[in-house]
Amino acid sequence: MHSLTTHKHVRGGDMTIRTRFAPSPTGLLHVGGARTALFNYLFARHHGGEYLLRIEDTDRARSTPEAVQVILDGLDWLGLSPDQEPVFQSTRETRHTEVAHSLLERGMAYRCFLSPEELQAQRDQAAADKRPLRINSPWRDRDLSEAPSGIAPVIRLRVPQEGETVVDDLVQGPVRVANAELDDMIILRSDGTPTYLHAVVVDDHDMAITHVIRGDDHLTNTFRQVQIFKALGWDLPRFAHIPLIHGADGAKLSKRHGAVSVLEFEREGFLPEALCNYLLRLGWGHGDAEILSRDEQVALFDLDGVGRAASRMDYAKLTHLNGVYLREADDQRLTTDLCRRLDLSPDSDASSRIRRLMPKLKERARTLVDLAESARFVIERPSGPKDAKAAALLSDEARGWLRALLPQLQATDFSAAAVDQALRAFAEEHGLKLGQIAQPLRVALTGGTTSPPIDATLEALGASEVTSRIEAV
């Protein structure tokens, strides 16, 4: 079990800001969760605080080590790894149970012996009355001497029935609910295991969390969790409920809209800094700057810039932004990624050729998948023209020109400048426009009609490879 503090951290007389990202390991890190993690990270960094990770793995059936690793890998890829080792909620069940029993001993909670049949009757009545279900337990005030045999009780919190609960949310503003609308929630199930709502409160307190930043789908939970904090006499954290991410059609984001998990975006060739930049600007505003470095994000981010309306995922805009980041990315870093995607040894000749071409290759690419595809000709000799347009360029006459050109190319040192000069001289000598020789040459070398500039392409491939490819046509 992780040893946790049970007090607010103090530094220089002031409370240290502590945030947490608390996902359930379901097998993927959703892009919405990634944005929540990013906001928690940036808020903590902006205020000189700490950003923690809690894995809410109390659902034993779904919470596998593999599912946990997906979350850890996704956060690591995004550059959002926590400041401390993750806390696993499942290891803290004893603590959760102790706190529940302390509430019971102080009269802030009670044992409830409602049978499954009695509970179902209340559900049926609520449905018939077309009203929200609110469990009314007679055991709130009944004497335990009347308890039936054969029913293992749950423990319910004794929620105030008068007044209202107000959450002064840092994004949504003041949100209130009449306490009469809240039922006495279960904090310990009949099998002795703690409920999610109860465990979260205990963990947030013990981890000294000062700010709970999460999706606004948790807002209704917050009213209930506030009751637990108050019953325990613990300081409340500040709450900030951020809007969810929807698809372009306004519906909840799902696979039908496109990639939804962080590792899908990685596979599809997005850079982590581009995805983070996009997610930050999705629902947070600060001036007109679209591209912000991580340091700039930390310096500028605060919750007052977060909007209340749901954001719509725009994959086209993300792809455009990714292209901007690609063009600014380090060439060796991109080459290393392409070697992985193309199953190349980083020390191979092909890797060196790709590295030389990278400044030109990345000019048109929008994703790393695009980039890898555009570099494929470096490692795979074309089996012929890729399409009809390319085939038309490689006419018998054009093949003759290429054979005539080859000795002139071989006479150069194969630098881009020398290749360019040789091509221009050949075109002028034969009364051709430069494109009339450059385009067939491009098809011969790459199989297609697009590539980096032809002089750079020849320089990267080298004399031997260029000779082999021209002779093959």
Swiss-Prot record:
Pfam families recorded: Anticodon_2, tRNA-synt_1c
Motif, 'HIGH' region: chain positions: 23-33
Top-rank taxon, per record: Bacteria
Record carries keyword Transport: no
Top class in the EC scheme: ligase
Coiled-coil ranges from the UniProt annotation: none
Family annotation (InterPro entries): aa-tRNA-synth_I_cd-bd, aa-tRNA-synth_I_codon-bd_sub2, aa-tRNA-synth_I_CS, aa_tRNA-synth_I_cd-bd_sf, Glu-tRNA-ligase_bac/mito, Glu/Gln-tRNA-synth, Glu/Gln-tRNA-synth_Ib_cat-dom, GluQ/Sye
UniProt keyword list: Aminoacyl-tRNA synthetase, ATP-binding, Cytoplasm, Ligase, Nucleotide-binding, Protein biosynthesis
GO biological process: glutamyl-tRNA aminoacylation
Main location: cytoplasm
Binding site for ATP: K255
EC number: 6.1.1.17
Chain location of the short sequence motif 'KMSKS' region per the record: 252-256
Cellular compartments annotated: Cytoplasm
MF-aspect GO terms: ATP binding; glutamate-tRNA ligase activity; tRNA binding; zinc ion binding
Gene Ontology CC terms, in alphabetical order: cytosol
Assembly and binders: Monomer.
Similarity comment text for this entry: Belongs to the class-I aminoacyl-tRNA synthetase family. Glutamate--tRNA ligase type 1 subfamily.
Function statement: Catalyzes the attachment of glutamate to tRNA(Glu) in a two-step reaction: glutamate is first activated by ATP to form Glu-AMP and then transferred to the acceptor end of tRNA(Glu).
Name of the featured protein: Glutamate--tRNA ligase 1
Gene source species: Granulibacter bethesdensis (strain ATCC BAA-1260 / CGDNIH1)
